[in-house]
Swiss-Prot record:
Residues 19-29 have a biased composition (Basic and acidic residues). Optimum temperature is 30 degrees Celsius. Enzyme activity is significantly lower at 20 degrees Celsius and 40 degrees Celsius. This is Acyclic carotenoid 1,2-hydratase. Induction: Repressed by oxygen. Belongs to the CrtC hydratase family. Its EC number is 4.2.1.131. Keywords: Carotenoid biosynthesis, Chlorophyll biosynthesis, Lyase, Photosynthesis. Involved in the biosynthesis of carotenoids spirilloxanthin. Catalyzes the hydration of lycopene to the corresponding hydroxylated carotenoids 1-HO-lycopene and 1,1'-(HO)2-lycopene. Can also act on geranylgeraniol. Residues 33-46 have a biased composition (Low complexity). It catalyses: rhodopin = all-trans-lycopene + H2O; 1,1'-dihydroxy-1,1',2,2'-tetrahydrolycopene = rhodopin + H2O. The keyword Coiled coil does not apply. Optimum pH is 8. No activity is detected at pH 4.0-5.0. At higher pH values, it shows rapid decrease in activity, although 50% of the relative activity is still detected at pH 9.0. It retains much residual activity after 30 minutes incubation at pH 4.0-8.0, indicating that CrtC is stable in both slightly alkaline and acid environments.
């Protein structure tokens, strides 16, 4: 998982994109006053070029039944709890995503894509969310005793790079949702799995200043990983790194943008709100000569969370290795988000650049030493204690309008 595009210090009054013109009239009559929202922090334009640093996640899921399926314990988990490993329950993972799964009331399911162009000039993040985890509307519904996840859906799109920054996260209700095994419709946007590739047709409006984001993204996995990992002792939260190595083709009409590059797909699902199970986590991934290396270190609210260190190759095979010692990183400069990572003894980890500094989420470039290789990672820190605070909750609505229905 990860959160993305969330409330950077200037996000509430961010400069508007250049392509506003008449697109703002679309959907305008149906938007309720913008409320908070966010998902996961896109890299800002103008950061250090990051050829080969693929970060992301999203897509694919398991069989048609309820969200279930447990696995054997991961050898890399800390203590005796968390970090279990197994095959996605009720499905053939080689067949790709299933979009018709049932979700526990109060729970969530998302598919996440992150990609970077081959020249390092452009990037994107897309999250298709059912039971939007950072939605204030969903939180209010849970408090009222009506926690219907399918009434709180969104397609979060973040574009960054030379063409400028775009960010969308319009929440939609149950009437705007259509689910089939190989297709998911959220309002005017949809995701389709054809057996070999994922196609995402985007038709969304940016916030807070409206402009259109429209076009097609194709994701071609090198292979589909067959293992999933539980993140909490109760096994209610599951992470599936579906395709850590993928090719991505971007063809957008608005803004006019065409590029191809490398990407990463995963999916997260849970049977309760994230903040009920976790205090915080650090997550990172990097391309290395041996493949894609990933670290996921979770602090559970009760018991022991997962501590995972994984290597993936282009064939989709995953190898666990013992997590290196945990080290502290400097807190972020504005919102003072705590950060940490793992690094082999005798070496030092360092923050190369802070990309996003928000009230409860930070995204950074971090250099560390993993499995005998120096790696520059895209790194994320999420504080769910911060997220759950009343002050932060009041901030969230400015980036997430909701369409009724």
């Amino acid at each position: 998982m990860r959160a993305a595009g969330i409330l950077t210090p200037g996000a509430l009054w961010a400069p508007g994109p250049s392509d506003t013109r008449d697109e703002r009239r679309h959907d305008a009559g149906r938007l309720q006053p913008a409320l908070p929202g966010d998902g996961r922090g896109p890299l800002r334009p103008g950061v250090t070029r990051m050829e080969g640093l693929l970060h992301a996640s999203s897509v694919a899921q398991q069989g048609a039944g309820a969200l279930s399926g447990r696995g054997e314990r991961a050898s890399g988990s800390r203590g005796t709890d968390g970090g279990h490993v197994g095959t996605p329950g009720g499905s053939d993972p080689a067949r790709g995503p299933r979009f018709d799964l049932r979700i526990t009331p109060g729970g969530y399911l998302w598919w996440y894509l992150d990609a970077l162009s081959d020249d390092g000039d452009h990037g994107l993040t897309i999250i298709a969310m059912l039971g939007s985890v950072f939605s204030p509307y969903y939180a209010w519904a849970r408090r009222r005793g009506n926690p219907d996840p399918l009434n709180h859906c969104a397609l979060n799109v973040a574009l960054y790079g030379k063409a400028g920054k775009r960010w969308t996260m319009t929440e939609r209700g149950r009437k705007a949702l259509r689910q089939a095994p190989g297709r998911l419709d959220i309002g005017p946007s949809h995701l389709t799995w054809d057996g070999t590739a994922l196609t995402i047709d985007v038709n969304e409006i940016t916030a807070p200043i409206p402009s259109r984001v429209r076009g097609r993204i194709r994701v071609i996995p090198a292979a589909v990983n067959a293992r999933e990992f539980t993140l909490d002792p109760a096994e209610r939260h599951v992470w599936w790194p579906i395709a850590p190595i993928s090719r991505v083709e971007v063809d957008l009409e608005k803004p006019a943008l065409r590029w191809s590059g490398h990407g990463y797909l995963d999916s997260n699902r849970g049977e309760e709100p994230l903040e009920d199970a976790f205090q915080c986590w650090d997550w990172s991934r990097a391309n290395t000569p041996s493949g894609t290396t990933m670290l996921y270190d979770v602090t559970a609210r009760h018991g022991t969370g997962a501590s995972l260190a994984l290597r993936f190759n282009a064939s989709g095979e995953v190898e666990e290795f013992p997590p290196p010692p945990r080290v502290r990183l400097p807190t972020t400069g504005i919102w003072r988000i705590k950060r940490g990572t793992q690094c082999e003894a005798g070496h030092q980890a360092r923050v190369v650049e802070t990309l996003e500094d928000t009230p409860f989420y930070a995204r950074s470039l971090v250099e560390t030493r993993l499995a005998g290789e120096t790696a520059t990672c895209v790194h994320e820190s999420l504080s769910l204690d911060r997220f759950a605070s009343p002050v932060v909750q009041l901030m969230l609505p400015f980036r997430m309008p909701r369409v009724g229905g």
